[in-house]
Amino acid sequence: MENFYKVGTIVNTQGLQGEVRVLPSTDFANERFSKGAVLALFDDKDNYIQDLKVKSGRLQKNFYVVKFEGFYHINDVEKYKGYVVKIAQENQEELNDGEFYYHEIIGSDVYENDILIGQISEILQPGANDVWVVKRKGKRDLLLPYIPPVVLKVDVAQHRVDVDIMEGLDD
């Protein structure tokens, strides 16, 4: 099977007409959840279920309300709560130099002054900037905003991120 990459999680239903709320995990949410987009549905055990074609999608707060073709009632979609929607690798957008996908960053080692401090486990999108969650041994997770003074260098090929932890970020 080809490579697929997560673009969102179905977190709930919306209304009675078969719409779902999708929590996006992509910087290309407008493209992924727009009319005509094709997504692959995976269950909570990461088993492929089926391809879905977006009939309509709209942003509502921090969710996308999406209607897929062929689903007309809440009963058709209720069972998909907690399932993940992904895109096939060949459907990924081409990126500019210095840009990267979440899956290329998650799992990367994080260094400050050439000292390993942990690994990126998750990327959050709380607002203006992404926040990278760094898992550390024996310490609580470190939340790093993805801003130039903090993230100094990202080497996707080496799975390495160099950072400068500003005062107050590690309290």
From Swiss-Prot:
Domain PRC barrel: 97-169
GO CC terms: cytoplasm; ribosome
Keywords: Chaperone, Cytoplasm, Ribosome biogenesis, rRNA processing
GO terms (BP aspect): ribosomal small subunit biogenesis; rRNA processing
Top-level division of the source organism's lineage: Bacteria
GO molecular function: ribosome binding
Quaternary structure (record): Binds ribosomal protein uS19.
The keyword Aminoacyl-tRNA synthetase belongs to this UniProt entry's keyword annotation: no
Pfam family for this entry, one: PRC
Species annotation: Lactococcus lactis subsp. cremoris (strain SK11)
Family: Belongs to the RimM family.
InterPro entries according to UniProt: PRC-brl_dom, PRC_barrel-like_sf, RimM, RimM_N, RimM_N_sf, Transl_B-barrel_sf
Protein name as catalogued: Ribosome maturation factor RimM
